[in-house]
């Protein structure tokens, strides 16, 4: 092993020298020679191994190991180390051995490391500390002695920190600036300057022919910077539009006023509070903090210094006249705001005043820091949740505040503040003025808080509040107050995608003119305040903007040890988002384990996605997936993992993809299993009350919990509350379950048709949306082709009507029939299906084996058919055997409509999926279509994963295979059938999200055609299912789509057959409406657009 600086004779071979440097961590000096090679040979081989090269001593070159840290990490470490005392330095050196070094693992590759990367980092820190503090006389000789001063970024970091230590200002425009711009790249101007400087530097290096240092390996391999991201994922800046539109948007509605006439409060009926106190919204269970009063909380001189720069922000250019008696008050917004409803190029950005006065606003930092400290001390859980939620780039002076509202001489009428983070509190303080009165009164508490200069009030801004009267208003009075808070709109998917596009643009500018360097790229690398997010470079261009935004949202929460819910509509690629997250986590912590919990039918989908994207660099050496069967391969993988846990082999990170049923057994086998990250697919299952799965998961010590679900809200709003509470336990401490249920009840009351509940529903809806934004990434929209979704109300044949009357299919009777399992859906499918079902057995029309009709000994069942029923069943079988198919089909309205839809799709040379919940219906459909010579394939819930995979492949590749018949509740999950652009829901389930999952098998990413959905509704059981569905859809829209919605009344639904815009469909509807069933009733009674079954309120 080499010691210190080793001279290598010219007879040594270059390969052996580089092997020694790479494995031992020592440095070596080489000279060009026939046996070593020329400069080009030395530099190219050094670069290939990711080693570093410095142009000293004179005539020779020094080879150094790869630096095992990223540039920004090294800069931060050197900053802390050079300013630390000796004890703190020793602590830092010790801590170096406790962290991961993914760059080191990659650079060593197949070599066996004979040193710890912490040793090398420690040497760099020690040298940097010496350089920063060295006398001027000692600095110049170091240039010829230390190779560290010849390689980036060490040389730039050392010179930069020395300038700071000496009090010398760093000129960013100086071409000799010691710190590379990429270390502090944040603004567009910085990025553009970097690109120009880098191009100039390369030109100079080429012309000089010197080699002070070989270029570091690039951030990625085989991908040009221009091809790194897909079109639409990078910010496009239109300077002309920005100049004309940015300053038109300083106005935004920030208050919710609840009446047309402003209501002003007086002290009458309010208790004046003058002493420090904390208030709750109720006594006993379910209470929550709503106000904390701190008189004299901030020194007056701190307040007045901040007032000098904040007061000019308060102008009459605002939309707050309704809370000021009809006249615009003097008020303004400082910091960041979400201009979601304005025609701006940037929806989330600095306010106009902030953009023009950032330099002056530094004088308000002591005030903000003081308020932030009070907040963390007196409402620690609210403060913690707000710190978790706030995006780092929107933090004002490192606090949990993104925004400040400045009010001057403004006595507000009663209002609530819109868009504030509801798991946090607003922080109000008076910072200047001479006045009497004008207390802040909160109606619900019946308290008025005296606020003089320096007094502070933390309070729930969703409660109605306003100022009391000013004493002696005829005397000139002055009062300036500020409210500091977090705007939840800054965490919307719109803002997340906008921010992601901006970061992508900076990354491209940062990588401009660089050489190929690595197979991964840190797509958060343009902003050092963000946690790293590593993505395979060949994969990045396949990630849609919404997927990149979701990844950014997740890693910001995991960095703060919080989980989150990813609520992306089906088909937007949640699985790829999750796998990319796993890649980044394992890149940073290669020995960590990750647990992915998913329903059994979807496990193969995860494996397929892993294999598919592995071709684009998404590699996982230890990806263990099983449905719980003790297969040989799975057992071998578990044994290998066991050996690593027992230290028999080096520990490597594993990803386990398992189903909930196997989880308990897995945890029994691997006690003290502690995953770094836990992902729950179709995570709405976690929200069920008394869920054993949740109990098992809660036993795992893992704070980083990610829930994936396109349908996080299935039946009621409390499910969303339990989901968010599961990913972040602190939520229930600031919003108790009882309070959330009250909000949910307000929404439910309106959804179910009580128009008088509209006002309360809107308030509750806004509160829940503002509460969940910090923990739920929502993207319910998509850029897919059009979706045409229809409700087809099918008629009944005379035989069906006869049995309907016999069964008494009223709504009351429907409930009774459900209890005894006489399912009217069999009758709506076909009389033959119904008669076979009640006889307790029928011959499967696909496989030829007898099915016991899902029999259950605990269920009463008619065991014998009446004679007429037996004759009819035999007659129906004869119709099929004699190929009198039209007569057989015309016995059912739904079957007649279905067959005509299938024949239309076949004539158009397109493909169709038919979903049904019931085996009897699936069999009957399959046999009927097969008899009609329509090529059909059926996939049921009991079918193996291999059969499903073959069905997918066959359906995609075989142009003759027109129809797939699938089980709705099982086969709908985890399958991709985008070859079809027509979907029939032959029957519907009480939970509309089950149907939504089914539709998403065809209506998802990679679908290139418009998709038409046909929901077949009979006059028997389905109308009650529909009523349940529309209520839940209205609730879903209220909470996740931010649209106040309710069920449509029967007389509000309009038959769209006659006014259908598509001529071919209009003709088709008309044909079905004139088609007669047995008994002369119409096959199709009405056609409605499904989206109109739920009405949105303005």
Curated annotation (Swiss-Prot):
Cofactor(s), by name: Fe(2+)
GO molecular function annotation: ATP binding; ATP hydrolysis activity; DNA binding; DNA translocase activity; helicase activity; metal ion binding; thymine dioxygenase activity
Binding locations of Fe cation: 415, 417, 465
Domain of life, source organism: Eukaryota
Motif segment (DEAH box): 681-684
Function: Dioxygenase that catalyzes the first step of DNA base J (beta-d-glucosyl-HOMedU) biosynthesis by converting thymine to 5-hydroxymethyluracil (HOMedU). DNA base J is a hypermodified thymidine residue found in the genome of kinetoplastid parasites, which is localized primarily to repetitive DNA, namely the telomeres, and is implicated in the regulation of antigenic variation. Probably also acts as a DNA helicase. Recognizes and binds specific regions of the genome, hydrolyzes ATP and allows the DNA base J de novo synthesis.
Single biological process term from Gene Ontology: base J metabolic process
UniProt-listed SUPFAM superfamilies: P-loop containing nucleoside triphosphate hydrolases
Start and end residues of each Helicase C-terminal domain: 897-1057
Family according to the record: In the C-terminal section; belongs to the SNF2/RAD54 helicase family. In the N-terminal section; belongs to the TET family. JBP2 subfamily.
Entry's cofactor comment: Binds 1 Fe(2+) ion per subunit.
InterPro entries listed in its UniProt record: 2OGFeDO_JBP1/TET_oxygenase_dom, Helicase_ATP-bd, Helicase_C-like, P-loop_NTPase, SNF2-like_sf, SNF2/RAD54-like_C, SNF2_N, SNF2_RAD54_helicase_repair
One cellular-component annotation, GO: nucleus
Protein name as annotated: Bifunctional helicase and thymine dioxygenase JBP2
DNA Helicase as annotated region, ranges: 541-1098
Source organism of this protein record: Leishmania infantum
């Amino acid at each position: 092993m080499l010691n210190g600086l080793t001279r290598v004779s010219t007879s040594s071979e270059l390969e052996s020298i580089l092997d020694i440097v790479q494995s031992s961590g020592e440095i070596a000096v080489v000279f060009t020679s026939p046996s070593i090679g020329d400069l080009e040979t030395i530099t190219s081989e050094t670069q290939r191994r990711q080693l570093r090269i410095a142009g000293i001593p004179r005539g020779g070159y020094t080879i150094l190991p790869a630096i095992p840290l990223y540039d920004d990490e090294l800069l931060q470490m050197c900053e802390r180390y050079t300013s630390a005392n000796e004890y703190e330095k020793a602590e830092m050196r010790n801590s170096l051995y406790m962290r991961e070094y993914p760059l080191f693992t990659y650079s060593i590759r197949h070599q066996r490391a004979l040193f710890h990367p912490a040793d090398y980092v420690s040497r760099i820190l020690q040298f940097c500390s010496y350089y920063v503090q060295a006398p001027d006389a000692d600095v110049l000789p170091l240039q010829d002695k230390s190779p560290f001063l010849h390689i980036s970024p060490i040389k730039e970091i050392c010179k930069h920190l020395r300038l700071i230590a000496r009090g010398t200002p760093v000129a960013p425009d100086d071409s000799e600036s010691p710190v590379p711009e990429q270390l502090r790249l944040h603004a567009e101007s910085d990025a553009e300057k970097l690109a120009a400087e880098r191009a100039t530097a390369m030109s100079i290096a080429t012309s000089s022919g010197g080699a002070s240092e070989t270029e570091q390996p690039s951030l990625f391999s085989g991908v040009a910077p221009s091809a790194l991201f897909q079109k639409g994922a990078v910010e496009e800046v239109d300077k002309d539009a920005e100049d004309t539109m940015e300053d038109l948007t300083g106005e935004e509605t920030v208050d919710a006023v609840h009446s047309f006439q402003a209501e002003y409060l007086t002290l009458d009926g309010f208790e004046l509070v003058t002493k420090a106190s904390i208030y709750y919204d109720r006594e006993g269970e379910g209470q929550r903090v709503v106000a904390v009063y701190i008189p004299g909380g901030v020194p007056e001189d701190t307040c007045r210094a901040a007032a000098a720069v904040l007061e000019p922000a308060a102008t009459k250019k605002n939309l707050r006249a309704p809370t000021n008696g009809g006249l615009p008050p003097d008020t303004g917004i400082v910091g960041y705001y979400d201009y979601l409803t304005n025609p701006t190029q940037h929806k989330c950005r600095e306010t106009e005043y902030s953009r023009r006065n950032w330099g002056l606003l530094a004088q308000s930092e002591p005030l903000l820091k003081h308020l932030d400290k009070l907040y963390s001390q007196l409402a620690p859980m609210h403060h913690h949740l707000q710190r978790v939620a706030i995006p780092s780039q929107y933090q004002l002076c490192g606090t949990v505040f993104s925004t400040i509202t400045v009010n001057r001489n403004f006595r507000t009428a009663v209002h609530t503040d819109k868009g504030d983070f509801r798991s946090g509190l607003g922080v109000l303080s008076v910072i200047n003025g001479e006045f009497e009165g004008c207390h802040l009164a909160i109606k619900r508490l019946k308290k008025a808080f005296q606020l003089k200069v320096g007094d502070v009030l933390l309070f729930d801004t969703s409660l109605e509040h306003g100022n009391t009267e000013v004493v002696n208003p005829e005397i000139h009075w002055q009062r300036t107050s500020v409210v500091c808070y977090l705007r939840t709109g800054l965490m919307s998917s719109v803002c997340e995608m906008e921010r992601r596009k901006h970061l992508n643009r900076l990354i491209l500018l940062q990588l401009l003119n660089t050489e190929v360097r690595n197979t991964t790229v840190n797509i958060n690398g343009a902003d050092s305040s963000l946690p790293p997010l590593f993505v395979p470079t060949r994969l990045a261009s396949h990630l849609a903007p919404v997927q990149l935004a979701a990844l950014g949202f997740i890693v910001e929460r995991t960095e703060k040890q919080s989980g989150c819910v990813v609520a992306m509509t089906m088909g937007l690629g949640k699985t790829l988002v999750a796998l990319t997250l796993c890649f980044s986590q394992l890149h940073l912590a290669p020995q960590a384990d990750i647990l992915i919990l998913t329903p059994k039918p979807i496990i193969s989908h995860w494996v397929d996605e892993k294999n598919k994207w592995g071709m684009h660099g998404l590699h996982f050496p230890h990806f263990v997936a099983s449905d719980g069967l003790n297969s040989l391969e799975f057992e071998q993988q578990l044994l290998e993992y066991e050996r690593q846990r027992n230290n028999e082999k080096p520990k490597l990170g594993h990803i386990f993809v398992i189903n909930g049923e196997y989880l308990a057994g897995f945890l029994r086998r691997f006690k003290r299993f502690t995953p770094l990250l836990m992902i729950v697919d179709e995570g709405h299952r976690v929200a069920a009350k008394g869920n054993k799965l949740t109990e098992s998961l809660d036993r795992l010590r893992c704070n980083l919990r990610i829930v994936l679900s396109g349908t996080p809200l299935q039946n009621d709003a409390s499910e969303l509350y339990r989901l968010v509470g599961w990913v972040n336990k602190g939520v229930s401490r600031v919003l108790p379950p009882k309070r959330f249920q009250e909000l949910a009840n307000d929404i439910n009351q309106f959804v179910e048709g009580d128009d008088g509940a509209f006002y309360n529903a809107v308030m509750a809806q806004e509160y829940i949306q503002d509460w969940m934004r910090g923990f739920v990434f929502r993207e319910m929209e998509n850029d897919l082709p059009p979706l045409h979704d229809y409700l087809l109300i099918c008629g009944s044949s005379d035989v069906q009507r006869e049995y309907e009357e016999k069964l008494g299919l009223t709504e009351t009777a429907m409930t009774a029939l459900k209890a005894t399992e006489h399912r009217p859906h069999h009758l709506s499918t076909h009389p033959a299906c119904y008669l076979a079902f009640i006889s307790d057995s029928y011959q499967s029309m696909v496989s030829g084996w007898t099915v016991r009709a899902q029999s259950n000994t605990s269920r009463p069942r008619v065991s014998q058919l009446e004679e007429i029923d037996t004759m009819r069943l035999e007659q129906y079988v004869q119709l099929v055997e004699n190929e009198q198919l039209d007569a057989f089909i015309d016995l059912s309205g739904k079957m007649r409509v279905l067959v005509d839809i299938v024949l239309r799709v076949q004539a158009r040379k397109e493909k169709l999926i038919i979903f049904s919940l019931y085996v009897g219906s699936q069999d009957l459909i399959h046999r009927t279509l097969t008899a009609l010579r329509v090529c059909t394939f059926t996939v049921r819930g009991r079918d193996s994963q291999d059969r499903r995979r073959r069905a997918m492949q066959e359906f995609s590749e075989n142009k003759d295979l027109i129809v797939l018949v699938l089980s709705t509740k099982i086969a709908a999950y985890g399958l991709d059938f985008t070859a079809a652009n027509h979907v029939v829901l032959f029957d519907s389930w009480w939970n509309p999200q089950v149907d939504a999952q089914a539709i998403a098998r065809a209506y998802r990413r990679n679908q290139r055609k418009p998709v038409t959905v046909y929901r077949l509704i009979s006059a028997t059981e389905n109308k009650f299912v529909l009523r349940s569905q529309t209520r839940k859809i209205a609730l879903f829209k209220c909470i996740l789509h931010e649209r106040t919605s309710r069920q449509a009344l029967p007389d509000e639904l309009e038959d769209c057959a006659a006014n259908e815009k598509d001529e071919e469909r209009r003709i088709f509807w008309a044909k079905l409406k004139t088609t007669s069933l047995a008994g002369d009733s119409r096959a199709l009674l009405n056609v409605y657009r499904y989206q109109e079954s739920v009405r949105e309120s303005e």
